[in-house]
């Protein structure tokens, strides 16, 4: 699955909340995780940070991982062979992960947990409650 080639990765974080193209790409990618016959699933992008990092963030957040785990997972890319070949630097990476974290944390209701806000986002982009439960079941069992 190619999430999208027309999307500029550096603005991925801001646009997943506003642009239908991004929402549709995420929905299609996430639907793959609803069917246990699709496992194991390997997903990647050019550096493993932008599209891959966004998808991994959503999946891990949906499964209840805490903020520290989400940040560590995302920042691992920085230490890969190609992790900083784009010259983004640690400050840019922190900005990107902060955009994801706070974008989801405050998505629907700031009193809701991160996981609840991610679930609300997934429902808003067209996944069903059954889809969400299937993803969790497939990843947690």
List PLM regions with ranges.
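Cys-dependent protein tyrosine phosphatase-like superfamily
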Residues: 1-42, 54-141
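Ser/Thr-glycine-rich phosphate-binding loops at phosphate-binding pockets of nucleotides
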Residues: 47, 51-52
């Amino acid at each position: 699955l190619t999430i999208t080639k027309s999307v500029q990765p550096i603005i991925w974080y801001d646009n997943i909340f506003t642009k239908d193209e991004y929402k549709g790409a995420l929905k299609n990618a996430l639907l793959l995780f609803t069917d246990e016959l699709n496992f194991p699933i390997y997903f990647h992008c050019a550096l493993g940070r932008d599209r891959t990092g966004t998808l991994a963030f959503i999946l891990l957040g949906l499964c209840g991982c805490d903020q520290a785990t989400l940040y560590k997972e995302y920042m691992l890319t920085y230490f890969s062979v190609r992790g900083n070949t784009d010259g983004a630097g640690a400050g840019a990476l922190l900005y990107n992960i902060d955009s994801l974290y706070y974008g989801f944390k405050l998505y629907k209701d700031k009193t809701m947990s991160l996981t609840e806000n991610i679930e609300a986002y997934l429902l808003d982009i067209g996944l069903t409650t059954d889809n969400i439960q299937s993803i969790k079941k497939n990843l947690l069992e």
